C-alpha cells in the first residue's frame, strides 16, 4: 500500500526530476498535487520545472559522479528521467544500490540509444521496423547507405529533436551528412543508424501506460514534424480498427520488454492496416501535450500515477483536440508575451513554459484547442499559437 509523506518533513515522499523542461514541469505539478516533495535537476538554472519545485540543482547530468553525489545527498524515493542526456550507466548502478529509477534503469539506458531500442524491437521482439544498418566510421557509413539504397535517413544513435539527422537522396550528400551526424550526436560523435524510408499514411504516438492494474492506452495521437520537432499534434487520430489493434499489440510488447511502471510514448508509422515501429520514450512525449485538454487525465498525471504504483482504471478522452507549438525566433534573456487576450479563443488554452532565455528558434509554449473535428481543432490551435506575440 502506498504511503505519501508530507513534503518538507522527514517522512516526505521525494521525486527527483532529471531534466526540468516543459514536460518535467507538468510532471512536477502533478507530483505537487499529491503533496510530493519535488527536486528538479537540469544543466541550466531557472528551467521550467525548477520554477514549481521545492528545490533545484544545476549539474551536468552526463557526469556520473556528480549525479551519484546528488542522489546520495537528496535520497529521493523516485528518480524520474525526463530527458535522454543522462549518465544512464550510473542510473543502472544507482538502481542496483536500491534506488527506484522510473520506469527502470534498463529502459532508460536502452531507449537513449537508437541501436539498443532498435535491436530490442526488431531482433528480440520481431516487431516490424524500417530497414537499417549501423556504422561507426565514414567508410562503413558509405557501405550502409549502399546496402539500404537511396533515399535513406541517417541519424546519430544518440541524439534528440532532429539533431544530426539528414535525408540522403544521392551520393553527393554523403560527406555532408556524415559530418552533420557527427556534430549532432549527444556524445559529440560516434555511431549512426542508416534507415530506409518508410511509406506511410501518417505517424502516431500511442501513449502506453504500464501500471499496477495492467497495460492501458490513450487514443492515438497524430502529429506533424518539421526539422525533427513536432509542430502540431491532435487526438484522436483516425485509423482502422485492425491497425489500432496491431499498434496496441506492438506497443504492449515493447513496453513490457522494457519493464517498469510509467507512461511510454510509442511512435509508430501507419500505412493502411499495417503498422511499423519507429521509436519509444519511457516518459511523457512532447506530442502528448495535447492530452492537457483532450483527456481527464493528462499524460503527466498518468505517468505519476503509474510510477507511484496507483491504478489507472480508465482514461476518458473528451473528443477532437489539438496542440500547436509557440515557436518564436529571437535572442533574449528577458522574454515577454503579449496579445494573449486576442489569442485565447473559446475552448482554447495556452501554456507558457517560462524558459529563461531564447537564442534563435525555441519552443516557448503551446496552444491547446478542442473543436467538433480534429481538422478544426488543429486550425484553431495554430491560430492561437500564431497570435501570441513574443518579444525580448
UniProtKB/Swiss-Prot annotation:
Pfam families recorded: ATP-grasp, PurT_C, RS_preATP-grasp-like
EC number: 6.3.1.21
Residues given in the record as ATP binding sites: 114, 155, 160-165, 195-198, 203
Residue positions binding N(1)-(5-phospho-beta-D-ribosyl)glycinamide: 22-23, 82, 286, 355, 362-363
Protein known as: Formate-dependent phosphoribosylglycinamide formyltransferase
CC terms in the record's Gene Ontology section: cytosol
Gene coding for it: purT
Principal EC category: ligase
Role played: Involved in the de novo purine biosynthesis. Catalyzes the transfer of formate to 5-phospho-ribosyl-glycinamide (GAR), producing 5-phospho-ribosyl-N-formylglycinamide (FGAR). Formate is provided by PurU via hydrolysis of 10-formyl-tetrahydrofolate.
PANTHER family in the record: FORMATE-DEPENDENT PHOSPHORIBOSYLGLYCINAMIDE FORMYLTRANSFERASE (PTHR43055:SF1)
NCBIfam families in the cross-refs: PRK09288.1, purT
Similarity comment text for this entry: Belongs to the PurK/PurT family.
Keywords of this entry: ATP-binding, Ligase, Magnesium, Metal-binding, Nucleotide-binding, Purine biosynthesis
Functional pathway: Purine metabolism; IMP biosynthesis via de novo pathway; N(2)-formyl-N(1)-(5-phospho-D-ribosyl)glycinamide from N(1)-(5-phospho-D-ribosyl)glycinamide (formate route): step 1/1
Catalytic activity: N(1)-(5-phospho-beta-D-ribosyl)glycinamide + formate + ATP = N(2)-formyl-N(1)-(5-phospho-beta-D-ribosyl)glycinamide + ADP + phosphate + H(+)
HAMAP family listed in its UniProt record: PurT
One GO-annotated biological process of the protein: 'de novo' IMP biosynthetic process
Binding site for Mg(2+): 267, 279
Xref: InterPro entries: ATP-grasp, ATP-grasp_carboxylate-amine, ATP_grasp_subdomain_1, PreATP-grasp_dom_sf, PurT, PurT/PurK_preATP-grasp, PurT_C, Rudment_hybrid_motif
GO MF term set: ATP binding; magnesium ion binding; phosphoribosylglycinamide formyltransferase 2 activity; phosphoribosylglycinamide formyltransferase activity
PROSITE patterns xrefs: ATP_GRASP (PS50975)
ATP-grasp domain sequence ranges: 119-308
